[in-house]
Every structure is written in C-alpha cells, then in structure tokens.
Amino acid sequence: MAIVTLLALQFTSPGPTLVEIGPLSIRWYGLLIASAVLLGISLSSRLARRRDIDPNAIADLAVWLVIGAIPAARLYYVAFEWQQYASRPAEILAIWHGGIAIHGAILGGTAALILFARRRQIPIWQLTDVVVPSLALGQAIGRWGNFFNSEAFGTPTDLPWKLFIPIDRRPLAYIQSEYFHPTFLYESLWNLLLCLLLIWLFRQGLRQRLPLKAGVMTCIYLIGYSLGRIWIEGLRTDSLMLGSLRIAQMVSIVAIAFGVLGLVWIYGLKRSLPDVVRPAISGESRSEL
C-alpha cells in the first residue's frame, strides 16, 4: 500500500509557457532543449578527454548538431504528417508548437557529425561514442517538453501515475477519457537509465575491466534506445504511421539490426582493433567522469 501511495503521482501540465514578458514568451520546450544541449556539451567534453579528443571541439560540434538535428527532426515529422500542414505551410516553421521526431534528429545529427569529424579529422566512431551518452541524457530531458505541451501521450489508463490531458488535446477516439499513460515519463526514465549504462561502460573500459573498442557505445545506444522505443511507441496514440505500421517501431527494428551487426563487426571481424579507451593518467582524477 505504501508503494502504491508513493507512486500515486497524477501528472497535470501547467501549460507550455514558462513566463511571458510583454510580447515575448519563454516556453518550457525551448528551455528544456537549451538545458539538454548545455548539459550534453559538459558531459561529452569530459568523456572526450579520455578519447584523446580536444574537449573544445565538442562545443563546436554542438553547433553543427543543432543545425543538423533540429530542422531534420521537424522535416521528418512534417513529411509524415503532411496532410495537416499542406493547407498551413507557415505552421511548418512553428516548431515551438511541438512536432519533432527524434529519429529525424538522429539522422540529421549523424550527417552533421560525419561532416564535422571529417573536417576536423577526428575518427567518427570515437566521436559518436562520446556523444551518445549526452544524446540519451538530452532525450531524457527533452521528453518533458511533451509533458508541458500535453502531447505524445499514451492510451487511457487508471494507473496511479496517470497523466491528465485537457479535452482540447485528446484524440477524438478518447475524447471522454481524462487520464492517459505518461509515455513521456517512461521514455525519460528509460533514456536516463541508458545514459547511466553508457557512462558505466565507459568507466569500465577506462579501468580496463572491459575491452571497450571504438563504436561499441554507439551500438549499445542504438540497441538500448530502440528496444525501449518499440515498447513505448506501442502505447502512444499519435504515432507517425505508414499504412498500418508505426514508423518509429520499424525504424527502431532497423536500428537494433545495425547495432547488433556493428558489435559483430567490431568484435568478430575486426579482432585486431586496439582498445580505444585509455586508462586514467597518473594524477588525473577519475571524478571527471
């Protein structure tokens, strides 16, 4: 009973706007994205030091990632929801109203990262490995934007941790239902655990307890995030669809395949590759991670 009482957290969004100053307004979504970027830069910079990557390059990379990821995330979403934007093309630019797709962001961010890595002559897999923990952390933070916007929620539920959705935000099929699965919370917690797992793997490799090679953390991210997304996407009421199939689930299955094949390639076909996480230098604090 005590556990049920502890988990009895009814979530109700205060609205998408944090504060309004005259004609200007600061929205929760924007604040969360900015916070995710700053925290991601800090985390990846710390990891980069142990991968012999200039930590100052991470801040430069962040600019490239934002430029590549956010427009791609929006365009990905709009492409699969074109019917609602065809008659309102100006709304395509209104990203503050919500409507971005993480898979689009990953595709756009990956393209930007590859271009950046080649320009700076940084090994791509080394760079992706120090970015994916921050990506998972950023997703954990960013999902709360869905909460404030009352979007990307699940099917109706009476669970103690239910999410209240205003009537004007409910799907027509569930217009009489007040409470829904807080899928934003599920994915936020899943991504936070994934971030902690990736950092733990990095530390284990740093201490030479695991033969961590370039690309392993990237593959683990692809597998870990996608497994959670397949489950959570099945609960959502607003999935992007291709016929009767949920696009996010299909993309996640492909990502899992890439992750598994990547691990086989790294450890099976490339056995001569050296371990790439260097041990801590004498006098260098492990607390940096």
Swiss-Prot record:
The keyword Membrane applies. It is found in: Cell inner membrane. A 1,2-diacyl-sn-glycero-3-phospho-(1'-sn-glycerol) binds at R143. It is a multi-pass membrane protein. InterPro entries: Lgt. Pathway: Protein modification; lipoprotein biosynthesis (diacylglyceryl transfer). Pfam families: LGT. Its EC number is 2.5.1.145. It comes from the Bacteria. GO terms for biological process: lipoprotein biosynthetic process. It is an enzyme of class 2 (transferase). One of its GO terms (molecular function) is phosphatidylglycerol-prolipoprotein diacylglyceryl transferase activity. Its main location: membrane. Belongs to the Lgt family. Catalyzes the transfer of the diacylglyceryl group from phosphatidylglycerol to the sulfhydryl group of the N-terminal cysteine of a prolipoprotein, the first step in the formation of mature lipoproteins. This is Phosphatidylglycerol--prolipoprotein diacylglyceryl transferase. It comes from Synechococcus elongatus (strain ATCC 33912 / PCC 7942 / FACHB-805). The lineage of its organism: Bacteria, Bacillati, Cyanobacteriota, Cyanophyceae, Synechococcales.
